[in-house]
Amino acid sequence: MKELLKLVKVEFQKLKRKKFILLVTLAAFMFPLPLAYLMTTPAMMEQYIDKADAFDGLFNMVLGYGIQFLLPCIIGVVAAMLFFIERDNDTFKNIKTIPLSSTQVVTAKIIVLFIIGVVFCIASTVATVLVGMFTLDVYGLGYKIFLAVETGIFITAGTLPLIVIVVFFSRTYVFSVLLCIFYSVLNMSATALFDALPKTILWLLPTPLTTFWSAGDMKRHGINMNLVQMNGLIPSTFQVILILGIMA
């Protein structure tokens, strides 16, 4: 266990040298800022009961656009950096001299991806609170942060199949980024077409699956959500864990 923790620390040091952790944190503000401005328009405010309800709407939009669209791209790019850095620096021979198995090295990299996913989701939630507190009524932070953590874990787990493709079939960072963008657009398109696509396809894609689950979870926690059109599409937490666990 100590060796694994040391490996995780080493992987973070690699990202720190590239200043990517700071970029991930700044990226968390990419969607909350414009969405918060959008929420202040009269056309948007009249759709909500009060400012607390509008804050729920802002959080839901950040969850859908900021996290579930942007996070797979970030995870894919970070994975490419972590798995390609030994190749780029020609340090494979150095790793082979260390008494560590390939499984330990790969596990450490995957743990870093999950931590990055959770950190990004928490940062996005904090950004939503910071930009929303000036015009909306902020409340329910404990639940929203917990939901963001769950979403980060689920989205990262669902992105692991993409990482396999990136690592084994991609040879350049540009192709990796394009592949991640395509993957995110594919998932978001499927989510938008939920009323036209079979349930099986929607549940096999991590973003629609997580979107439907999070919508149902927010509804159960008293957040005003119109889920009439999603009837029959909302999975249980056990089903989400089972499906994403198989994917991962």
Ranges and model annotations:
Residues M1-F29:
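Aromatic- and glycine-rich beta-strand/loop motifs that create alpha-glucan
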Residues T41-L58, V177, V185-A248:
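Terminal transmembrane helical anchor/hairpin motif
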Residues A27-V77, T107-Y173, Q229-T237:
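Secretory targeting signals
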Residues M30-A36, T125, F182-A192, L209-T210:
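Aromatic-anchored segments of alpha-helical transmembrane domains
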